[in-house]
Each structure stands twice: as structure tokens, then as C-alpha cells.
Amino acid sequence: MLLSELTHQSLSKITLEKYSNSFVPYLYLDGHRSGSNGFSDSEGYKNGYMFFLRFGRILKQLGFKQMVTMVHTQRNFSSKERIGTILKAITNNFDDKNEFIKNSLFKIYGDIDSYKQNGYSDFYKFLLDINNKPSMNQNFTHHILINYSEEWALKNLQKINCIPEISSVIRFTKGFVSGGWIPIKMQTTSFIYSQIPSISEFWSDESITALILISLNIWITTKEFIGTKSYCQNEKEMIHQKRDLELCSDTVKLEIQCPMHNRIIAFGINGPISYEF
């Protein structure tokens, strides 16, 4: 399958105006240490930050307005060396003159007071400076989860209510959402898994675009089946035949350029779908 076919498959079913606000991917960045063979952890986290920027820029170019990103959970905070490396990678590479950043609104969610209490006062001030800071043209919003936990979220539901409904969790290297569940915001959320990490050097713009379109297409085709779906007899028979009796699964080969081979696994109505490129 060509990227143009995937684009047509996804976007022919919708108008961007209809879903520009309601399609909100949740980017769960991961794999920067184990995937950074050949360069330091610091370079790995920098690569993760650059992937985040590129993903957001492409998402915005496609016409969408918001995304949610997990930086690190509160559980990660126990590893001081790791946290210090993550924070350094962010502050050293955050450029408020960057056109995409300059035209974005940042909203921060998590226990940021712990940074001040544990010797990271400069980073604490950095987060305060960017949180809800008016931008030149607030046509894209980043919802940033940092030092986040479900326990913090339950105690701060008023803040959590500012996060939009999550359409798709995009998880890298690991097939679970650990420490990153967002209460009341994940009622119709699909799950997308990338086998390779969110390391910028591993991804072309074309492959990031494919990741976004796969997430969009799966969300559109499955969200009506979550919780409130009423099945007619023909639907029951068709799904039962394909999913239960045939154990249906699909593999789609994408003809796109990418520095690394990858497998993206999604879950359709009839079974898993593996996109390989």
C-alpha cells in the first residue's frame, strides 16, 4: 500500500473540519535508552524530544489542533540520574523561537512541585514559564504530562478536565499504558503500538504521517463499537465469522521510505492489523 492510498483510506471518510478538534492522539514516548545503542542516554532523550516536535508539526499540518504527550511518570522520579538527563535534554533543546513552538499553547499536568523540592528549581521555573503562556497564534495545543500519576490525576480532576477526550494512545516499544492512564478521558480510546522507539533518527516524515493516519483510521472505524453499539443480525454474523471462527488478522505492507524497518500494530473490529514498512 502506498502512503497516498493510506491517506485516501483515512481522509476520504471524513472532513478535516469535522475531526480537527476531536481527533486527539496521546503520544506515549519510550525506548530512548534501549534504542539508543551507539549514542548516550542524553542523545537518546534529545532524539525523543525531536520526534515529539516533528510529530506535532506534521499533525498540525494535517489540520489537527491538539495532542497529549507523556514525558515521564511519577514512578520514574525515583531514578534521579535518569530524570536529570531527561530534564537536561528538554531545557537544552527547547527553543521558544522555533516557529512551531512559538505558535503553540502548552498546558502542563503533573506533580511539578516535586521538582522544586528535589533540587530542580530551574526546571520548575521553566515549566511555570511555558504553562499556559500566551503564544502568537494559539492554533495548536500541547497537553504535557510530566511527573504524572493516576493518583495525582484523581486529586486534580479539575485540571484533568482541561484535557480533551483521547482518541488514540500511541505506545512505543511496550504494549501497555503504565502509569499514564487519564481518568474520564479515555472512554473511546484505541491503542496503537509501534515496535521501534520514538527516536527521531529512526523515523522519516513519511512514516510519522503514516503513524498518524493509521491512528486516525482505526479510531474512526472502531469508536462507534465501544460501549454504545447496537448490532444488527448481519453485523453479528459477519464479525463472529471473521473474528471468532477465522481468527482474522491482516498485514499491510506500506511502500514508504524510512530509516528503520517498523511494525505498527492496531486493532480493528475483526482482529489485529499489522502495518509494516
Describe each region flagged by the PLM.
Residues M1-F277:
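Flexible, compositionally biased loop and terminal segments
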